[in-house]
Amino acid sequence: MSSTDDTQDAGRRRRFLQGAALTLVAAAAPPGASATENARIVAEDHWARKGAVKLYLYRKRMPDNGPPRPVLFLVHGSSFSGRGGFDLQVPGTANYSFMDEFARYGFDVWTMDHENYGRSSQTQSNSDIRSGVEDLKAALPVVESVTGQKKVMFYGQSSGSIRLGVFAMEEPERVDRMVLDAFTYTGEGAPEIMRRRANIASLTASNFRPTSQASFDAIFARDDPSTVDPAVPKALGDYELKLTNRTPNGTYVDMAIHMPMVDPKRLLCSVCMTRAEHDGNATDAELLDFFSQLPNKDKQFCEIRGVAHVAVLGINRHRIWHVMHAFFTLPTQRSA
């Protein structure tokens, strides 16, 4: 990247940070205070192409009334779509939408449904990690054409963090900083990964597994069901099952037998790793090993109590949102 690009990135962040104090005040407002803000949030549908595959992109932000807002792109995991998981509306319960929360913080928030998820094309592919990386490569030029920003911030959840890690290795010029949440490095000794490894014959026998409401209930019951409101898997199932009743197996296969896929030494940007108190997809030892190898010293590792694997949909989601917001708004380094 050129020094001109670096200067422009620093300038955008400085302009954004000038409003950080106001953002924090808004974030601390009581729940009822956000209703008007939610009504003002602008939502847009966009599309990308990966050959014959149509990829659905979804954007939410506050109305434009100043300099460009920093772009935050959210990468979903193995079991539900981007819009379904990151913009979830839970009847009778406010503030479950990750996208709304960060739009209120001042971000231009994007996500996508990977191939065979949500509103994107339904094909016969198993939608493995490699497929998801190619999805991101198709999506980011669309984001750039709409926002004018080539280099953006990212969040990846579970297998989405693996997709994101591979993408960052291959297209580092597009990644400003990123959060790897519920990441798996090797999976050795992790209960959920060992379960998938033992079930590999079934996972490779078909590119898909059937999905039902019980599938979504099981995701949230797996690690610690006390960390989630039962209304959440019900709302998620209601959304997802209107779009498809199958889930591709590719990422499960990769996580069972193809780890590691991300080389920490090749991640050049600033990285924050977030680790739930209850998460069977990795061990502390493997994640700390990965973290120790990250070359950029502007890095963070945060283990959070009161949350499980899908922390951003847990009762204590506000705690991981706080960590991410602080990381994404970290002031730029001053010269001596």
What are these regions (language model features)?
Residues 1-11, 22:
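N-terminal secretory signal peptides
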Residues 15-35:
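N-terminal export signals
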Residues 36-64:
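N-terminal cap/lid segment of alpha/beta-hydrolase-fold proteins
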Residues 66-68, 72-104:
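Short, surface-exposed "cap/lid" segments of acyl-processing enzymes
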Residues 134-150:
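Conserved acidic catalytic loop of the alpha/beta-hydrolase fold
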Residues 192-274:
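Alpha/beta-hydrolase
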Residues 280-286:
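Conserved alpha/beta-hydrolase "acid-adjacent" motif
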Residues 307-317:
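Catalytic histidine-centered segment of alpha/beta-hydrolase-like enzymes
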